[in-house]
Curated annotation (Swiss-Prot):
Species of origin: Salmonella typhimurium (strain LT2 / SGSC1412 / ATCC 700720)
Entry GO CC: cytosol; small ribosomal subunit
Organismal lineage: Bacteria, Pseudomonadati, Pseudomonadota, Gammaproteobacteria, Enterobacterales
Role of this protein: Located at the top of the head of the 30S subunit, it contacts several helices of the 16S rRNA. In the 70S ribosome it contacts the 23S rRNA (bridge B1a) and protein L5 of the 50S subunit (bridge B1b), connecting the 2 subunits; these bridges are implicated in subunit movement. Contacts the tRNAs in the A and P-sites.
Signal peptide residues on this chain, from the entry's feature table: none
Subunit field text: Part of the 30S ribosomal subunit. Forms a loose heterodimer with protein S19. Forms two bridges to the 50S subunit in the 70S ribosome.
Gene of this entry: rpsM
GO molecular function: rRNA binding; structural constituent of ribosome; tRNA binding
SUPFAM superfamilies (alphabetical): S13-like H2TH domain
Biological process, per Gene Ontology: translation
Annotated protein name in UniProt: Small ribosomal subunit protein uS13
Length: 118
């Protein structure tokens, strides 16, 4: 297994799909990385040479991925919560942030129903 950005990339998958196992790399970014590295999209990771894997590592390192991206996202949410803006309050209360209705739906964000005790 090739190790890129601290993640074991599956050998048996095509390169364009295998790179999506890295957090922050989707299909579009994966295709851009492969094009910049000069590697075909349909080649499997196990068929790549060590030099090609090194170029992939260099190309992936140009983007914010994995732990750095997770930290950046959590810090931006924390910043909103510290500011006390509307979006920050919604994050703090565990409610939908982007204007969805909450009277009937939003069960994913609110969690399971809490029964009213009589």
């Amino acid at each position: 297994m090739a190790r890129i950005a601290g993640i074991n990339i599956p050998d048996q998958k095509h390169a364009v799909i295998a790179l999506t196992s890295i957090y922050g790399v989707g299909k579009t970014r994966s295709k851009a990385i492969l094009a910049a590295a000069g590697i075909a999209e349909n080649v499997k990771i196990s068929e790549l040479s060590e030099e090609q894997i090194d170029t992939l590592r260099d190309e992936v390192a140009k983007f914010v991925v994995e732990g750095d991206l997770r930290r950046e996202i959590s810090m931006s949410i924390k910043r909103l919560m510290d500011l006390g803006c509307y979006r920050g309050l919604r994050h703090r209360r565990g409610l939908p942030v982007r204007g969805q209705r909450t009277k009937t739906n939003a069960r994913t964000r609110k969690g399971p129903r809490k029964p009213i005790k009589k």
